[in-house]
Amino acid sequence: MNPLICAASVVGAGLAIGLGAIGPGIGQGTAAGQAVEGIARQPEAEGKIRGTLLLSLAFMEALTIYGLVVALALMFANPFVS
């Protein structure tokens, strides 16, 4: 097993999960802040805003899970290691 391939796999896995979590994390914070602001402006629309927020948070979290899957594949099911 080539140590350079192993090192590149570890770095790639770290980048996959790190960069895969940074964007959705920022997006989730922004979405939650805007939802709180929307509920403060229109308290009667709380249910609709909350439902839309939860759906959008689930879609954003899926991106992080995809990054985790790529990282796990690079660590444990690496196609480059024979």
Curated annotation (Swiss-Prot):
An example GO CC term for this entry is: proton-transporting ATP synthase complex
Annotated membrane topology is:
Multi-pass membrane protein
| Stretches of the chain forming a coiled coil according to its record | none
Please give the SUPFAM superfamilies that the UniProt record associates with this protein: F1F0 ATP synthase subunit C (SSF81333)
Q: In chain numbering, where does the site feature Reversibly protonated during proton transport fall?
A: E61
What's the chief localization of this chain?
A: plastid
Its recorded name reads ATP synthase subunit c, chloroplastic
Q: Which organism is it from?
A: Ostreococcus tauri
